[in-house]
């Protein structure tokens, strides 16, 4: 099977699109190494969107107290895309300070983020397992 398209969830929202329009033969990312973490991205929206637009986004993602990172992961896993890729920073629920790279910049922060294995908790692994099973991706 040839993968012919890739989409980044954060960009879909900027384009006014939804995962409903994603075809099966697609790779869907919550984010990549070149854009902000899901938490960092969502927090940055306070400066870009009205409170009504932010509430609309929360409604689309069915976001509640579980955290925006988990809402974006669940939303992605419900898409028809054959493959969904989630950066570990999103699983860990980390913010902009854990961003991997900022394209077009020269910074000591680029490519310097490292994960300590103790950061990945059993509860996070169980949550990913549950999301995977609920989306019939197991």
Where are the regions that the model predicts?
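Carbohydrate-interacting/catalytic domains
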Residues: 7-16, 22-23, 36-138
């Amino acid at each position: 099977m040839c993968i012919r398209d890739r989409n980044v969830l954060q960009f879909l929202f900027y384009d006014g699109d939804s995962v409903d329009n994603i075809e099966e033969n697609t790779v869907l990312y919550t984010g990549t190494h070149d854009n902000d973490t899901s938490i960092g991205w969502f927090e940055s929206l306070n400066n870009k969107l009205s409170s009504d637009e932010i509430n609309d986004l929360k409604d689309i993602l069915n976001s509640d107290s579980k955290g925006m990172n988990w809402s974006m992961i669940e939303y992605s896993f419900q898409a028809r895309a054959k493959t969904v890729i989630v950066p570990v920073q999103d699983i860990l629920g980390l913010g902009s300070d854990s961003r991997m790279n900022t394209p077009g910049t020269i910074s000591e922060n680029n490519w310097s983020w490292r994960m300590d294995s103790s950061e990945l908790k059993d509860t996070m692994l169980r949550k990913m397992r549950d999301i995977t099973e609920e989306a019939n991706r197991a």
